[in-house]
């Protein structure tokens, strides 16, 4: 399971700066989701090959009222969701009563935490450590988030305390043994295809899960890795194994009350990253809302195969249905590769067809293709539509190979590849999707330049080659001398 790290501290200690530094770009921020405080943000981050989810919480002072009190409550809830907490303090301002209150809360909750003394610029690190030692959080790690100083030491300390899962360890072993670290995932014998059911609260996720499982089944499977993990529900259908990753919480047959279903961003993001296929559930009567776009964007960024289920389709008038379909085409253009199903989870209409799309999307996401096949498609695409000229020179694309899966990563080699326009990349992506008959999965294309790998290198001759070269040169000199003597 992907670990969750929360940034906590009073206002203006540099949490957002640290968040943007670790996520590397503001584009990684999922954004302000409806129903959550605007100061609470979630991002997908990685450090030296290890992925984690980062939470930027609102500031906590201890004397909040009104809306600020609600924000502080949300920040404290984020602490509960996290595997690890980075407790940021301001080295310039020194220790405050708010810092002491937060430290006390972390101790009471028995949370694993590291004290981070931020804004250490032009301040003696030892003095800063001594300043905050009364907090009882151990030695503070000094950093300057705005400049990136101390970040390496901080992340090594944090990730060193979080155990690696089996997949990470296996990948590390492959790298250590010199094998190509490209993992082509497939359904394990135990889990089958892992399906994450995601969507906003009250769109019908719980009803859909139970409908797909069968009403006669009592859903009591609870295999959490931590106290806030999603519920994993293994089952079989038509001799195929599946595992639902359910973010709606534990429920039993006949006891589903979706109006009180709680939505957890962390659970949803973790479910997306751990799944093979995402079934994204929307409420047809509400249409497409910004919250839907945020969640779909994260699923797309994670590279997951996607199936869209538009629930509560029954009972809608013809005109309403036409309007919703128009809105889907207009607003979901960025996931136009995904199958869309119009269903009623309550009555079961159209639910059975979801399995076919899940199978097709998963197959498209993990199928291997040989280099010869991918290169032939590239050559045909280039013949039909040449890359543009750049400064009078034609961009040359030479060959392609598979670089990864789930999502498919196609690596294309050539010259001037850094100058390929986005429009031509989209053309190649659409060509691969059409020829390979891919459905339900995003495609990523990566370009490699045509640098000569032997440039600047000299061949080293063996002793045998040196002797042979010497004999040939001697023979050549003797032959040349004879020709001169004959003249």
Curated annotation (Swiss-Prot):
Query: Which portions of the chain have biased composition (kind: Basic residues)?
Result: 467-487
What SUPFAM superfamilies does the record point to? Answer: P-loop containing nucleoside triphosphate hydrolases
> Which residues are listed for GTP 2 binding in this entry?
199-206, 246-250, 311-314
A GO BP term here is: ribosome biogenesis
User: Where does the KH-like domain start and stop, copy by copy?
Assistant: 367-451
A Pfam short name:
MMR_HSR1
Q: Which residues form the EngA-type G domain?
A: 3-166, 193-366
Q: Where along the chain is composition biased (Basic and acidic residues)?
A: 448-461
Q: Name one GO molecular function term.
A: GTP binding
In terms of domain of life, where is this protein from? Bacteria
Keyword set for this entry? GTP-binding, Nucleotide-binding, Repeat, Ribosome biogenesis
Q: Where is this region: Disordered?
A: 448-487
The family assignment reads:
Belongs to the TRAFAC class TrmE-Era-EngA-EngB-Septin-like GTPase superfamily. EngA (Der) GTPase family.
What is its quaternary makeup?
Answer: Associates with the 50S ribosomal subunit.
What does the record give as the function of this protein? GTPase that plays an essential role in the late steps of ribosome biogenesis.
Q: Which PANTHER family match?
A: GTPASE DER
- This protein is called GTPase Der
């Amino acid at each position: 399971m992907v670990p969750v790290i929360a940034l906590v501290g009073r206002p203006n200690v540099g949490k957002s700066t640290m968040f943007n530094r670790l996520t590397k770009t503001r584009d990684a921020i999922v954004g302000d989701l409806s129903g959550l405080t605007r100061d609470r943000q979630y991002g997908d981050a990685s450090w030296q090959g290890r992925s984690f989810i980062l939470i930027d919480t609102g500031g906590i002072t201890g004397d909040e009222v009104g809306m600020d009190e609600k924000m502080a409550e949300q920040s404290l809830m984020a602490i509960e969701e996290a595997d690890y907490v980075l407790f940021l303090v301001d080295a310039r301002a020194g220790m405050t009563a708010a810092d002491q209150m937060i430290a006390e809360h972390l101790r009471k909750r028995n949370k694993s935490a590291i004290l981070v003394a931020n804004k250490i610029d032009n301040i003696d690190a030892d003095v800063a450590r001594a300043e905050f030692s009364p907090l009882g959080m151990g030695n503070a790690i000094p950093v300057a988030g705005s400049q990136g100083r101390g970040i390496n030491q901080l992340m090594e300390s944090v990730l060193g305390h979080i155990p690696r899962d089996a997949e990470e360890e296996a990948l590390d072993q492959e790298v250590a043994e010199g094998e190509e670290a490209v993992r082509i995932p497939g359904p394990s014998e135990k889990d089958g295809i892992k399906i994450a059911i995601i969507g906003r609260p009250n769109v019908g996720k719980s009803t859909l899960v139970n409908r797909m499982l069968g009403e006669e089944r009592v859903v009591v499977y609870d295999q959490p890795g931590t106290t806030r993990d999603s519920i994993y529900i293994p089952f079989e259908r038509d001799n195929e194994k599946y595992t639902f990753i359910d973010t709606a919480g534990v429920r039993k047959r006949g006891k589903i009350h979706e109006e009180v279903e709680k939505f957890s961003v962390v659970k949803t993001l973790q479910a997306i990253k751990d799944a093979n296929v995402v079934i994204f559930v929307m409420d047809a009567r509400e249409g497409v809302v910004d919250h839907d776009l945020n969640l779909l964007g994260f699923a797309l960024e994670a590279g997951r195969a996607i199936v869209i289920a538009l629930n509560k389709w029954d009972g809608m008038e013809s005109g309403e249905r036409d309007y919703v379909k128009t809105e889907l085409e207009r607003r979901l253009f960025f996931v136009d590769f995904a199958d869309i199903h119009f269903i009623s989870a309550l009555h079961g209409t159209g639910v059975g067809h979801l399995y076919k799309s899940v199978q097709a999307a998963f197959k498209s996401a993990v199928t291997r293709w040989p280099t010869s096949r991918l290169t032939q498609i590239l050559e045909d695409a280039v013949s039909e539509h040449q890359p543009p000229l750049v400064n009078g020179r034609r961009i040359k694309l030479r060959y392609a190979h598979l670089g990864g899966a789930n999502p498919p990563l196609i690596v294309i080699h050539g010259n001037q590849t850094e100058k390929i326009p986005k429009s031509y990349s989209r053309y190649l992506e659409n060509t691969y999707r059409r020829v390979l008959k891919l459905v339900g999965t995003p495609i990523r294309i990566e370009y490699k330049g045509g640098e000569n790998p032997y440039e600047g290198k000299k061949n080293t001759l063996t002793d045998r080659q040196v002797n042979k070269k010497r004999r040939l040169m001697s023979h050549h000199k003797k032959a040349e001398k004879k020709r001169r003597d004959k003249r």
